[in-house]
């Protein structure tokens, strides 16, 4: 007597149904409720497929008959093939014109990084890289042995796995393990029939040289793909070999998209009276850039050299080179009073600021900020709090105070 009949009811069969009757019932219901034919019956189709997968397996059926669905918990009943895979294996695929039979699966991609400089990305670069990979054995054509010598493993019926059932209290646990007779290969070859080149492994290791072209204008993180140059194995499509560009940080230029950014320092005289800056570009050119007298370059001002950026892979025009100017002021007391008087005549008149009439005024003197305090302020640390903490540390530090004498 069975504990539960739900799965039998799903297939509309008796609990004593034979495998042929189960198969016939599943075929009829699967065709009726397949989502390609009946789009609103997806859940029903999955329920039918699950019921058939369990009852078609003698071990699972015996466990279900004895303990019900509770006995299948942890036993892999829900870890089998999907409803679509079960349907495809049963009918061969291509039903209802909806799906084509599945082709061979694709192997794993091999991903490597290729380190480049910004100069490489500006000028382009070609490099050769050696790759060690598995390829189909040319001597046995991937069979692993003499033709006709490879047999399906009788112990696991060619699946490469075996199932063991354990009783754990009132529960039955069904576990999967690699078949020890074929080491998971699903096939066996007699030692005398093994291929001498690959020793039955079907593949051998081979060194391959790939020529990698880093095109002008490529970006950090961009991928260079070699289709199906990955490792080979019988029955699969080789994966791709993918090189990911890893750009080293540049000491002079920053890149954003197709644009370059450069930080230029000019002295105050050049900023006011004109002069010239020189920029070493990424292709060994030196750009001479005049600063027009009276142009008055301001601190942190941004200028642009159109078309001097990176070559664009998407547009015909290259990007721009943006130059951020930093004006370096002279040291204190750099000029005599007479020179300052001449400077005052040359510059626009100073703006005179004054307090409101009859306001209380107090004259103050500017002082230089302590370098340590400046760092704290730049890092948004309250200098008052920081100073207080330093004083506390000094008090706790190794300067003993007055101690009481023991009586």
From Swiss-Prot:
Keywords: Chaperone, Cytoplasm, Lipoprotein, Metal-binding, Methylation, Nucleus, Prenylation, Protein transport, Repeat, Transport, Zinc, Zinc-finger. The keyword Chaperone applies. CDD domains: DnaJ, DnaJ_C, DnaJ_zf. A zinc finger (CR-type) spans 124-207. The modification Cysteine methyl ester is found at residue 404. The keyword Mitochondrion does not apply. One of its GO terms (cellular component) is cytosol. GO terms for molecular function: ATP binding; Hsp70 protein binding; protein sequestering activity; protein-folding chaperone binding; unfolded protein binding; zinc ion binding. One of its GO terms (biological process) is protein refolding. Substrate binds at residues 110, 129-131, 209-210, 241-243. Residues 6-68 form the J domain. Zn(2+) 1 binds at residues 137, 140, 195, 198. InterPro entries: DnaJ, DnaJ_C, DnaJ_domain, DnaJ_domain_CS, DNJA1/2-like, HSP40/DnaJ_pept-bd, HSP_DnaJ_Cys-rich_dom, HSP_DnaJ_Cys-rich_dom_sf. A lipid is attached at residue 404 (S-farnesyl cysteine). Homodimer. PANTHER family: DNAJ-LIKE-2, ISOFORM A-RELATED (PTHR43888). Probably involved in mitochondrial protein import. Plays a role in microtubule cytoskeleton organization. This is Mitochondrial protein import protein mas5.
